[in-house]
Amino acid sequence: VEFMRSDIQMWKAVRTPIHQDELFRAYAGIKLMPGAREAVQHLLDQGVFVAIVSAGVDLFVSSVASMLKVDDWIANGFVFDDDGFLTDEGVCRLHASGKGDVITKLLAMNGHEAVNCVSVGDSEMDLSMHVEGSRFIGFNPSRDSSKEAFASAGVPVVVEKDLRASLPLMG
């Protein structure tokens, strides 16, 4: 929760108070990355369970999840007071380095085996989703540390910024 408090304090240092409507508007104009809609739809058409596991905020992730019509999603969240203003607290549902716990729970809740799980992520923190028996695809890493971590982990990496390029690696 500390990282969320820190982010909220940085925002409030620039502007306070911040109303939830402002945050909704800020996230309303998001665009999907190239190939996201097509890749997810292809997986859903094949009967694949698709979930978004993000250490981002629920306002953003819920919008993306809705646009893509995924089966499930989880993200951290904001807390607003009774008048709709952002408080200093956040809701921490998962840590960036603890996504593997979420993957394990999703697999158990939905009756899936790790051997049938493929996680896709763009940073070294996402490697935590590579639970035992599963597969992982590095996707368009931007930081050198992520590129190095993916190479050390021996996972395939898609360098194009088009999610469809990950489909052939999913098997």
Stretches with model-predicted labels:
Residues 54-55, 116-159:
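Acidic, Mg2+-coordinating phosphoryl-transfer loop and its flanking beta/alpha structural elements
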Residues 75-81, 141-145, 161-165:
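Short, acidic/turn-prone active-site loops that include or flank metal/cofactor-
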Residues 65-96:
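Histidine/lysine/aspartate-rich catalytic loop segments that bind and position anionic ligands
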Residues 25-37, 52-55, 75, 91-97:
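Conserved beta-strand/loop elements of the cytosolic catalytic core of P-type E1-E2 ATPases, chiefly
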Residues 81-88, 145-155, 167-170:
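Short, charged, surface-exposed secondary-structure boundary motifs
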Residues 1-44, 49:
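A metal-dependent, Asp-based hydrolase signature
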Residues 97-129:
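Conserved Lys-Pro-Asp/Glu-containing loop-to-beta segment of HAD-superfamily phosphomonoesterases
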Residues 36-68, 72-77:
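Substrate-recognition element of Asp-dependent hydrolases with the DxDx(T/V) motif
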